[in-house]
Structure formats: C-alpha cells, structure tokens
C-alpha cells in the first residue's frame, strides 16, 4: 500500500503534472494507491484559502477527480489505530529532541498503523520515524 502525501497529490493536480511522477504512479497497481484524511484536509484547506476564480475552480475540480476517479475513494482515516501509532512516534521524537509537526505525525501514524509506504517529496520530515518512505520525484 502506498499513501500519497499532500505534496504528491497536489503535484498531480497541476495542469501539467511532472511526467516522472505520472510515470511512477502509472507503474503501481491502482488499488495499492491511497491517501489519508489528513491529506484531504490539507488540500481542501489550501483550496479554501485561494481567491475565488478560475484557478481555484480548476484545482477544486482536479482534486475532486483525483479523489473520485484516481483514488476511487481510497482515503484512510486518522482512527484509533493511527492515533496509537502517532502517539508513540510523537513521544519518541519529542524525547529525542526532534518534535514532529502534528499533521505529519498524524500521516505517519496512519502509515505506521497500516504498514504502508508513504510517498512524499518531504522525505526529511519523515526520516527516523520508522516508516517506509519513497520520493516519487527520484524513484
């Protein structure tokens, strides 16, 4: 299972997505590609902050299409299992003097609870968290 982080999903919403990311994604079984409820929040929040207009409308349509057609509703929630994993990750990182941003630790918790690989360009945000991480830009 691959979880798309916010930056990967956002990159796919561009008018002309990076060919390397598209090729990487096309090489995966569609049913193995998921995202998280935290990522959905981050994208929707970003869209809400945009001024009304054609750009926002196009991005909202691209996001809806990504969720409905590309991911076919494959969105994992931040549930009890994810919260349990996130709590352990956050506490371990805080004790080590390397606190993690709350949304990143929630995404990490979801990935850890599902034993999923996280696809992100921000590999350094997730280093040392005990997750399998892949950067689609360099994969």
Report the location of each language-model feature.
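Short, well-structured N-terminal submotif of metal-dependent ribonuclease cores
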Residues: 1-35, 39, 48-66
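Active-site phosphate/pyrophosphate-handling residues
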Residues: 7, 20, 44, 84, ...
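A generic structural signal for short hydrophobic patches within well-formed alpha-helices
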Residues: 9, 40-43, 83, 126
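Residues that scaffold the ATP/ADP-binding catalytic core of kinase and kinase-like folds
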Residues: 11-12, 24, 46, 85-89, ...
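Residues at the C-termini of beta-strands that transition into short coil/loop
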Residues: 37, 79, 137
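Active-site neighborhoods of divalent-metal-dependent phosphate/nucleic-acid chemistry enzymes
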Residues: 45-51, 69-118
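Acidic, PIN/NYN-like endoribonuclease modules and their adjacent C-terminal/linker elements
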Residues: 108-139
């Amino acid at each position: 299972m691959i979880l798309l982080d916010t930056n990967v999903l956002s990159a796919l919403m561009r008018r002309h997505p990076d060919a390397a990311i598209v090729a990487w994604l096309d090489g995966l079984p569609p049913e193995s590609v998921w995202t998280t409820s935290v990522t959905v929040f981050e994208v929707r929040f970003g869209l809400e902050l945009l001024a009304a207009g054609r750009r926002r409308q196009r991005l909202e349509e691209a996001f809806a299409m990504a969720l409905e057609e590309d991911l076919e509703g494959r969105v994992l929630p931040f549930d009890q299992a994810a919260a349990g994993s996130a709590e352990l990750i956050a506490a371990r990182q805080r004790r080590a003097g390397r606190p993690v941003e709350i949304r990143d630790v929630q995404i990490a918790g979801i990935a850890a609870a599902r034993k999923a690989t996280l696809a992100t360009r921000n590999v350094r945000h997730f280093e040392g968290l005990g997750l399998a991480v892949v950067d689609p830009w360099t994969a």
